[in-house]
């Protein structure tokens, strides 16, 4: 995902530290959900707390966010439009999204997994001739 505020597999704790660091209401980022496989979390800071809203991928690649019960269900063609809508006050979040927290690099989990898989790959230099 090529969004500068998408942090991949950032943990909830790491997310909270990043969002609360500046003490600014409206800091936000998107990360992978730790508890719901395939879901994302839109996390936003407000009054020294972090609020998380789950984002689900619907049919045909659309996105749906879970906000409060009084907000009509809206489906978005992409995450940029979702963020754009919730960047305006009074759209159903505890506070509007005002300050994206940009990632330094994506999560290392995928890279770690790739490295672990590479341990079992052999190169020609690792082969030993076996005599009959």
Swiss-Prot record:
One of its GO terms (molecular function) is signaling adaptor activity. The keyword Phosphoprotein applies. PROSITE patterns: SH2 (PS50001). Phosphorylated on tyrosine residues; probably at Tyr-120 and/or Tyr-127. Expressed in spleen, thymus, lung, kidney, heart, colon and small bowel. Expressed in NK cells (all stages of cell maturation), macrophages and dendritic cells. SUPFAM superfamilies: SH2 domain. The modification Phosphotyrosine is found at residue 127. GO terms for biological process: adaptive immune response; leukocyte activation involved in immune response; natural killer cell inhibitory signaling pathway; natural killer cell mediated cytotoxicity; negative regulation of natural killer cell mediated cytotoxicity; negative regulation of type II interferon production; positive regulation of innate immune response; positive regulation of natural killer cell mediated cytotoxicity. Residues 5-101 form the SH2 domain. Changing residue 127 to F: No stimulation of granule polarization during NK-mediated cytotoxicity. Keywords: Adaptive immunity, Immunity, Innate immunity, Phosphoprotein, SH2 domain. Signal peptide: none annotated. Gene3D superfamilies: SH2 domain. SMART domains: SH2. InterPro entries: EAT2_SH2, SH2, SH2_dom_sf. It comes from the Eukaryota. Cytoplasmic adapter regulating receptors of the signaling lymphocytic activation molecule (SLAM) family such as CD84, SLAMF1, LY9 and CD244. In SLAM signaling seems to cooperate with SH2D1A/SAP. Plays a role in regulation of effector functions of natural killer (NK) cells by controlling signal transduction through CD244/2B4. However, conflicting results are reported which may reflect the use of different strain backgrounds. Binds to the phosphorylated receptors CD84, SLAMF1, LY9 and CD244. Does not bind to non-phosphorylated SLAMF1. Interacts with SLAMF7 (via ITSM phosphorylated on 'Tyr-302'). Interacts with Src kinases HCK, LYN, FYN, FGR and LCK (via kinase domains). Interacts (phosphorylated at Tyr-127) with PLCG2. This is SH2 domain-containing protein 1B. The lineage of its organism: Eukaryota, Metazoa, Chordata, Craniata, Vertebrata.
């Amino acid at each position: 995902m090529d969004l500068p505020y998408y942090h991949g597999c950032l943990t909830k704790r790491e997310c909270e530290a990043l969002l609360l660091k500046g003490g600014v209401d409206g800091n936000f980022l998107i990360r992978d959900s730790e508890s719901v496989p395939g879901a994302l979390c839109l996390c936003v800071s407000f009054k020294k707390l972090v609020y998380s809203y789950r984002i689900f991928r619907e049919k045909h690649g659309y996105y749906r966010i879970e906000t409060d019960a009084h907000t009509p269900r809206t489906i978005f063609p992409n995450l940029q439009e979702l963020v754009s809508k919730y960047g305006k006050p009074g759209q159903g979040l505890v506070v509007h999204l005002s300050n994206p927290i940009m990632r330094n690099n994506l999560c290392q989990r995928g890279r770690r997994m790739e490295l672990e898989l590479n341990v079992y790959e052999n190169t020609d230099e690792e082969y030993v001739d076996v005599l009959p």
